[in-house]
Amino acid sequence: MDGDKRIIALYNDYNTIIKPLIAEVEARTEQFPLPLFNEIRALHDHIARCYVEGFTEVQVDAEIHKAERHVIRIMLDCYKCLNLSLHDTVLLFEKQTRHVDLTVLHNGTFYPKYKSLRTQAIQTVRKAKILESMDTNAALDMYQTAHNVYGELESLIDSVTPDVHWARVRFTIRRAMQVLLWIASAVASGIISIFLTDLF
């Protein structure tokens, strides 16, 4: 493929893949991550060098290759930011529901699926981090897979949000019943011990 077609392919990737990812990062984090600025600047810098007067075809090819690596790096950084943001969403859910019996949601089907997806997402991110130093394309696929799993997990969490209040009430009632039973058993054992003391 000649240089112009490769540059067009780079801009096509930028417009169809990177821009939507950046928009999602901005929507989730309400900021534009600094590493993305640097990578985007470097991408455009290498493309601009392709048009320097007097550059040989070999030099242009080298600059395009560097730009292609920056495109992959931008996608990696976007998926890392998105996975981190989604993980924070999961942690917030866990913090908000730490006093909730999650096993009763969706007739008991929510919690096993939740734990499975959470574990799968975390393990996939770990594998991607290990792969990143050896094979960036494979790491990119793993980060994308992790993003999809986290997205499924977030949808699952969103589906139970209305039921969490009911589960919280149930948990509170169960806890109150445990306390009342403990108090009743303490009072009963006190009465029985007084009664037995009077008998003997």
Residue ranges and their predicted role:
Residues 68-119:
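Membrane-proximal low-complexity regions enriched in glycine and acidic/polar residues
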Residues 1-54:
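Leu/Val/Ala/Ile-rich N-terminal alpha-helices, chiefly Sec-type signal peptides and the beginnings
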Residues 104-177:
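Membrane-proximal, non-transmembrane alpha-helical segments
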Residues 165-200:
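Hydrophobic, helix-forming membrane-interacting segments
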Residues 25-34, 55-59, 129-140:
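Charged, low-complexity interaction regions
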Residues 50, 74-82, 152-160:
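Amphipathic alpha-helical coiled-coil segments
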Residues 34-38, 61-69, 137-147:
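Short, charged, amphipathic alpha-helical segments
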Residues 20-24, 49-63, 95-102:
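Short, charged/polar, low-complexity loop and linker segments
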